[in-house]
């Protein structure tokens, strides 16, 4: 999926996260800010990369502001932001697991 506009998903509440996504030329850039980065940073990054790969997102800027979200919340918020940022492209529903 090609990111064509900026999009947001999520909140800055406890146990949630805010996902900001924007178009960018070149490779995918992921920035993660988290209160629990030392304990769970590797897992957060893994979930983000797996979700973006499943949705075939290979370019863009993704900023994650995490407040202790579970993996399922990270996936859902990221999927929402990507779908909003892709606008009218045909959706591959099977990629949303």
Curated annotation (Swiss-Prot):
Pfam families: ACP. Its main location: cytoplasm. The modification O-(phosphoribosyl dephospho-coenzyme A)serine is found at residue 14. It is found in: Cytoplasm. Keywords: Cytoplasm, Phosphoprotein. InterPro entries: CitD (IPR006495), Mal_deCO2ase/Cit_lyase_ACP (IPR023439). GO terms for cellular component: cytoplasm. Oligomer with a subunit composition of (alpha,beta,gamma)6. Belongs to the CitD family. HAMAP family: CitD. Covalent carrier of the coenzyme of citrate lyase. This is Citrate lyase acyl carrier protein. It comes from Cronobacter sakazakii (strain ATCC BAA-894). The gene is citD.
């Amino acid at each position: 999926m090609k990111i064509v506009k900026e999009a947001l998903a999520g909140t800055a509440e406890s146990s949630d996260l805010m996902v900001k996504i924007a178009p960018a030329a070149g490779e995918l850039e992921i920035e993660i800010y988290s209160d629990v980065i030392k304990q769970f940073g590797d897992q957060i990054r893994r979930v983000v990369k797996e979700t973006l790969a499943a949705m075939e997102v290979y370019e863009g800027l993704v900023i994650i502001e995490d407040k202790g979200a579970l993996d399922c919340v990270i996936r859902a918020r990221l999927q929402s932001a990507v779908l909003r940022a892709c606008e009218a492209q045909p959706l591959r529903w099977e990629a949303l697991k």
